[in-house]
Amino acid sequence: MAAFFLGESEMREHSSDLFMMTLNPFREQTTTTNAHDDHFYNLCFGSQQYRPRDEVGHIEQGNSSISTFSNGGVFRALAPIYLKAAQELLNEIVNVGNGSHGAKQERPVSKESTIYGVEDINGGYKPGVAALQMKKAKLISMGEMVEQRYKQYHDQMQTIISSFEQAAGLGSANSYTHMALQTISKQFRAVKDMISLQIKQINKLLGQKEFDEQLKKLGKMAHHHSNAWRPQRGLPEKAVSVLRSWLFEHFLHPYPRDLDKVMLAKQTGLTKSQVSNWFINARVRMWKPLVEELYSEEMDIEESRKGSDRYSTKGSSSKQPYNNTTSNESSNTILPAFRQGFTETETPRQNSSSSCSVVMRFTKQHMNQANFINFNGGFENYHTMDGNSVSLSLGLPHSCDQTFNNIHFESTSHGTENSAIYSSSTYQIMD
């Protein structure tokens, strides 16, 4: 137990409690005290009596010993663990170390509590840019923490309200929680306003604009999004992907039914008319060009295949020189006969027997040369015609074809050899 007389304050440590008493230094101290005070001082100072303040010594600062009486009695604190902390507290409050036992001096304002931008602009201490940036980052994180804590308290209040309403009914908790919500919001709003004010002052020192404008600029630089008021052009990408997948799945018949349109509208979040309009445009812009491209590719493949077949047939025909020579000779002899027959038929064609005799004479001349005649595709594309019309190949009327009903023109698989097989037992040569 210890008692300290320090200027106007008397601190008593009784067990673990501290009692502060204000004393008047100009008032004479009475020697008579109550029984409780006598017992307390006897416990503190043994057989010593309570003496006036003029006998009280001084505190030797920096030492652990405290002089209490003029007769040299030295009292050491029973609890030296708390002595240093108590001295620091007293030095901070009444400034004992400087010897000023008078009135309390105002506590100096710390640098952390000052608002940057008020004193610094007047010519005071101006911190560095790095320190300001660090403080600004701390303040921003503090503001985010305040917002998170406010959300947490608000969620807790909502859970309390919901549980109370389950027991007492809807709207029964409004009268009890309205005031609490208002006070919480006011407190958090005040803290947030102070943080934003500090950030604005730091921004002024840094030579930047307002905090809100800076955030807008950073947002514009980071994200190049279109304005929210501008309407979106076209359909959403997800809806277009769903419609395009359905179109390619039903590529052969891209005409959805009403049920398909309703299903696609539910999947994409569009209306039925929007789905139908999209398919109309897609068939014109996507499906039709693809079909034309596929058709052109198939035609190119067929042409290349025909060209390869022609090259192969030319190679096979070059291996048969005998047939080539006969074909050349036959072509040289066919043309005069063909011209002769055509000139004869330029006269009135009433005498069909004369025209037929020309043809039979031509065939009789060349029957002995070979069993078949290769025309090299000369008459391959000419076909017989029905009725009594005139043939364009030989210029003969079709009435004479009745006498040659057993003449067969056969073409090989490659279309290169044409043979005329005649049976002499079924027809008669007309002179």
From Swiss-Prot:
Residues 228-290 bind DNA. GO terms for molecular function: DNA binding; DNA-binding transcription factor activity, RNA polymerase II-specific. One of its GO terms (cellular component) is nucleus. CDD domains: homeodomain. Residues 313-322 have a biased composition (Polar residues). Residues 302-312 have a biased composition (Basic and acidic residues). Residues 302-333 are annotated as: Disordered. This is BEL1-like homeodomain protein 5. It comes from Arabidopsis thaliana (Mouse-ear cress).
